[in-house]
Amino acid sequence: MNIKTLFIIILMLCPFTIKAQSSEKKITEHLTAITKTDGFRHYQNLPVLNQVADYIHSVFSKYADTTYFQTYNVDGKIYKNVVCRFGSDINKPILVAGAHYDVCGDQEGADDNASGVVGILELARMLHGKTLSRPVELVAYTLEEPPFFRTPQMGSYIHAESLKKNNTSVYGMVALEMIGYFSDEPGSQDYPIKPMKIIYGKTGNFILLVKKMGSGEFTGNFSSWFDNAQTIKTRNITAPAELEGIDFSDHLNYWKMGYDAMMVTNTAFYRNKNYHQTADTMETLDINRMSKVIDAVYHAIVNIDNKNTGKKNPEEERVKYTNSRKSYMEYLLLIMS
């Protein structure tokens, strides 16, 4: 048997797509373009918001089947989501991945949330030319930050509502929310409730996959394949929507429309004390680990319809919990992956 034949056999037996690699050089270039602007990209600074939206559009349009602005009016001003799609000719429910590009106040917002936006920009490059099992829509949202958070003016609300109104079939949605800040210092990780420190540890060196109880097939499959990538230390949590932090991003609006949705995050202010501060700059980010998060998201997207991860679905035990009576501490032990 020659080497070529052996290689073909290995590929046939391999149940998953070989992982692509994000580019740390590209990540740095995108972070610079988004954060080092003349002014800050908040709702009161429309020229800079539009500058960043145009940049995102220019990157999307290099790689995607279709790219467009989704515009809407708030108090007489026009704001823009930037949307692109891959696998447009596939007749299956779409997978949405999104991140907001606006910031809160006069600060660069590198982790919150240029890091998430760079994630979807890199996903666009990595998905280009790939054979997909279902359509993938990447969205850069405007107006996630206060004073619009939890209002119908959020860009993600506008997008999710448009899918609902157009009767678009949606498999699931994943929000990339602050994926660039990590710390190996003991005590660098906080939580909304103290017992979580026992389960997840006190060091902010992991990425967290956040889901609510009662989630569907998408969140389970995505989480399994994200874990399967084995690129970065990963933790899972499936908790009641009432737990503080569970809905702190754009995925909450897809929940409102009845879609299966989740968040990939470094836990925001529970770890990164630069949150909503001028110190949230790209110089504080861990580009290497950020790239590993992007690689895992890509791996999950391209393998989402392959059922054989070689691992248990991380949702299975959590679903069992829904109909059982356990103490809250037992529940916390259960949600750990």
Question: Where are the regions that the model predicts?
Answer:
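A non-catalytic alpha/beta surface segment that caps or lines the substrate-entry region
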Residues: E29-G87, I237
